[in-house]
């Protein structure tokens, strides 16, 4: 049974921890399909430093996440280059093998979705059975092909109230 890896990336929004709660809830409901859920401390940088924490499959421990702003696991704005030009993918591959990762969940905005896309192409090129999924969140509302994303509404509300 493969394990899952979740990472937060980009600017912390009022909803990024809510997304993490949703991931934990999905994990708890699918422990027959997912062995362990790991969270990377400080996004992709945590993966590169092997700085992962195991998230327990006990939803009651994480109830506060639904209402907690910020990024509890920390975040990163590190951008990966193209796989053929960036040797950091080798380290990411080593970590994925070490933890028997079958699913990588990248929570963030435009740059984070770019990272998810690059990771997906990298693992596909290696013919690795690793599913990479982007979980959109952005205060900028700059993800193409979307009307709006989680994080945008709360950012607009905050700015509007701040200038009134």
What would you call each of these model-derived segments?
Residues 25-35, 42, 78, 97, ...:
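Generic secondary-structure signature for well-ordered alpha-helical cores
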């Amino acid at each position: 049974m493969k394990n899952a890896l979740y990472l937060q990336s980009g600017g912390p929004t009022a909803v990024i921890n809510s997304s993490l709660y949703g991931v934990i809830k999905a994990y708890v409901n699918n422990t027959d399909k997912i062995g362990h859920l790991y969270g990377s401390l400080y996004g992709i940088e945590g993966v590169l430093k092997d700085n992962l924490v195991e998230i327990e499959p006990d939803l009651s421990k994480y109830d506060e996440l639904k209402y907690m702003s910020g990024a509890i696991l920390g975040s990163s704005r590190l951008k990966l280059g193209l796989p053929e030009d960036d040797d950091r993918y080798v380290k990411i591959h080593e970590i994925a093998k070490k933890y028997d990762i079958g699913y990588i969940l990248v929570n963030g905005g435009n740059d984070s979705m770019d990272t998810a896309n690059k990771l997906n192409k990298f693992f596909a090129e290696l013919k690795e059975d690793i599913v990479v999924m982007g979980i959109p969140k952005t205060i900028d509302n700059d993800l193409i092909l979307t009307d709006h994303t989680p994080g945008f509404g709360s950012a607009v509300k905050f700015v509007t109230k701040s200038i009134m």
